[in-house]
Amino acid sequence: ASDVYKRQGAGTDTIRIFGVDKLHGGTYAIIPDQIEAGTYMAAVAACGGQVLVRGIIPKHMDCITAKLQEMGVQVEEQDDTLLVRRSGKLRRTNVKTLPYPGFPTDMQPQITVALCLAEGTSMVTEGVWDNRYRYVGELTRMGAQIRVEGRSAVFEGVDHLTAASVQAYDLRAGAAMVIAALAAEGTSEVSNVHYIERGYENIIGKLRNLGAQIDSVECDETVETRQIG
């Protein structure tokens, strides 16, 4: 029971809330965004380098951290931060998206960019949504070797991606396109950036702070992204 409302089922699939005669004010802290943090971690995996991700709940990142570590990315936890590093070659792995605490479907497009550059053959299986591989065609234009087989996508790792003009078809696919553009050789353009801006606050500014060469072209909703040097 609670002095605000009565509830049953916390920690199960069903929560029942029983109304009360009167509610009163309170304070609630919104949890950090697991997917935004994971997106920057995936960018480190794809591009290399080092990033300190602050203001998170590391336990909420466990499934993402575990997969990146399988791929050879170093992740060190301290309090509410994760230090993410990648210097060597990426290793292959398989990923299946599941409801929390499994690997999040909203991280599927971002980690696939890293899998495109991993040695060997990797597989991603989408266990939550249908038709979530629309972005694959954009990655193949950049040189990725991917084939879709039902709910799974199979990746044959390549040495590098090549710059291209690509589209963001939705929020997370758009983030994946930005990561791919940062990892690719040459200058890329990503259009339909309104999808990306809907879910990432000041993504261009944050990436610039990390050393990315990225500019926004407001007139046609395009961002131009150059490889991190």
Stretches with model-predicted labels:
Residues 2-229:
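Short, structured segments at the rim of ligand-binding sites
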